[in-house]
């Protein structure tokens, strides 16, 4: 049985710590990120520096957000001025204050699986400051993020993130690549925010809408996943003439494309691109 101790540090379950130790996977992730010397690189949860080390071979400085106080001090001692360490919870961190005019953030990380979905939604607030994001996540979560309509994995997470990002499944990572090994398979995803026009609209294939309205709509739609939308969205009949717009309520929630949910949200909340901006 593999010990939870790695490089003199005991992995803490409450922080969801699983340290990446597979060199081939590490190099694959760094190559996928392909950092350039002038990038503003931000790592969430650097841990013991498995990604930090090879990334600092390509960039002169980085910023990291780390919650574990023991690791914060260790990182500061090890990297000195090359690493600006922000001690705190990424779920409450203001990533916007790291942005540099004309140099959007490149955010990376082996994210704690116990907070991955809330953290992804938190980061949506800063998408206008971001060039791209590369994250290690539970494979099931990545599958849901990139899922197509009609698949079992397609759901609220798929819709909410696909409206704001173009996403790609980069590579799979087996449990043995970590110490301690998690009980699930992992994967790396690339997330590229859809840019905005000069007027503030998203250049997304799914148009633009009020994210809060969309979130409430999708939550209702998927509240009874096995039933058709006639059962979950009928309360909206006074606000939307579904027949007039050709929206089939005889489908299940996972059968409806992202664009159709966005259109419903626009009808419910109007054109609110300015409210969905970070």
UniProtKB/Swiss-Prot annotation:
Gene Ontology CC annotations of this record: cytosol
Catalyses which reaction(s): adenosine(1518)/adenosine(1519) in 16S rRNA + 4 S-adenosyl-L-methionine = N(6)-dimethyladenosine(1518)/N(6)-dimethyladenosine(1519) in 16S rRNA + 4 S-adenosyl-L-homocysteine + 4 H(+)
EC class of the enzyme, as a word: transferase
Location(s) in or outside the cell: Cytoplasm
UniProt keyword Translocase present: no
PROSITE patterns named in the record: RRNA_A_DIMETH, SAM_RNA_A_N6_MT
UniProt-listed Enzyme Commission number(s): 2.1.1.182
GO molecular function: 16S rRNA (adenine(1518)-N(6)/adenine(1519)-N(6))-dimethyltransferase activity; RNA binding
Keywords attached to this entry: Cytoplasm, Methyltransferase, RNA-binding, rRNA processing, S-adenosyl-L-methionine, Transferase
Binding site for S-adenosyl-L-methionine: 18, 20, 45, 66, 89, 110
Pfam families according to UniProt: RrnaAD (PF00398)
Coiled coil region boundaries: none
InterPro entries referenced in this protein's UniProt entry, alphabetically: KsgA/Erm, rRNA_Ade_diMease-like_C, rRNA_Ade_Mease_Trfase_CS, rRNA_Ade_methylase_Trfase_N, rRNA_adenine_dimethylase, SAM-dependent_MTases_sf
Main location: cytoplasm
Family of this protein: Belongs to the class I-like SAM-binding methyltransferase superfamily. rRNA adenine N(6)-methyltransferase family. RsmA subfamily.
The protein's role, per its UniProt record: Specifically dimethylates two adjacent adenosines (A1518 and A1519) in the loop of a conserved hairpin near the 3'-end of 16S rRNA in the 30S particle. May play a critical role in biogenesis of 30S subunits.
Protein name (database record): Ribosomal RNA small subunit methyltransferase A
Protein source organism: Cupriavidus pinatubonensis (strain JMP 134 / LMG 1197) (Cupriavidus necator (strain JMP 134))
């Amino acid at each position: 049985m593999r010990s939870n101790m790695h490089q003199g540090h005991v992995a803490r379950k409450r922080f969801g710590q699983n340290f990446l130790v597979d060199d081939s996977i590490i190099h694959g992730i760094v190559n996928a990120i392909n950092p350039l010397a002038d990038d503003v690189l931000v790592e969430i949860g650097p841990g013991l520096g498995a990604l930090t080390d090879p990334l600092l071979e390509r960039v002169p400085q980085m910023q990291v957000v780390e919650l574990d106080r023991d690791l914060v001090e260790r990182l500061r001692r090890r990297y000195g001025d090359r690493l600006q360490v922000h001690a705190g919870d990424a779920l409450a961190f203001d990533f916007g204050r790291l942005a540099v005019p004309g140099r959007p953030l490149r955010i990376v990380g082996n994210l704690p699986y116990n907070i991955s979905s809330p953290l992804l939604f938190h980061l949506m607030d800063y998408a206008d400051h971001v060039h791209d994001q590369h994250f290690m996540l539970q494979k099931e979560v990545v599958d849901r993020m990139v899922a197509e309509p009609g698949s079992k994995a397609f759901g609220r997470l798929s819709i909410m993130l696909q409206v704001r990002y173009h996403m790609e499944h980069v590579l799979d990572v087996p449990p043995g690549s970590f110490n301690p090994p998690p009980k699930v398979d992992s994967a790396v995803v690339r997330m590229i925010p859809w840019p905005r026009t000069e007027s503030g609209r998203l250049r997304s294939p799914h148009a633009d809408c009020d994210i809060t309205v969309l979130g409430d709509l999708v939550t209702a739609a998927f509240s009874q996943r096995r039933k058709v939308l006639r059962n979950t969205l009928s309360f909206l009949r006074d606000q939307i003439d579904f027949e007039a717009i050709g929206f089939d309520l005889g489908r299940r929630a996972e059968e409806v494309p992202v664009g159709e949910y966005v259109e419903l949200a626009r009808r419910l909340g109007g054109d609110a691109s300015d409210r969905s901006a970070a």
